[in-house]
Amino acid sequence: MKEQKWIHEGLITESLPNGMFRVRLDNEDLILGYVSGKIRRSFIRILPGDRVKIEVSRYDSTRGRIIYRLRSKDSND
């Protein structure tokens, strides 16, 4: 059986080397997030200030995988 993961939304606060980011979740927790392979292959740029969806393991709640970058409300598309 596959491990259940929690999915949270958060804000990128800091960019770290090797595709790692510091993410402040909506519940005010600060965790370390890394970019998932799909986002890396699609060349999606993630910058500080972006809102993201992050998948967190139940066993280690200090690290998570960034699985989606949410669209910003003030973009001029």
UniProtKB/Swiss-Prot annotation:
SUPFAM superfamilies: Nucleic acid-binding proteins. CDD domains: S1_IF1. Residues 1-71 form the S1-like domain. Keywords: Chloroplast, Initiation factor, Plastid, Protein biosynthesis, RNA-binding, rRNA-binding. SMART domains: S1. InterPro entries: NA-bd_OB-fold (IPR012340), RNA-binding_domain_S1_IF1 (IPR006196), S1_domain (IPR003029), TIF_IF1 (IPR004368). One of its GO terms (cellular component) is cytosol. It is found in: Plastid, Chloroplast. GO terms for molecular function: ribosome binding; rRNA binding; translation initiation factor activity. It comes from the Eukaryota. Pfam families: eIF-1a. One of the essential components for the initiation of protein synthesis. Stabilizes the binding of IF-2 and IF-3 on the 30S subunit to which N-formylmethionyl-tRNA(fMet) subsequently binds. Helps modulate mRNA selection, yielding the 30S pre-initiation complex (PIC). Upon addition of the 50S ribosomal subunit IF-1, IF-2 and IF-3 are released leaving the mature 70S translation initiation complex. NCBIfam families: infA (TIGR00008). Component of the 30S ribosomal translation pre-initiation complex which assembles on the 30S ribosome in the order IF-2 and IF-3, IF-1 and N-formylmethionyl-tRNA(fMet); mRNA recruitment can occur at any time during PIC assembly. Belongs to the IF-1 family. This is Translation initiation factor IF-1, chloroplastic. It comes from Platanus occidentalis.
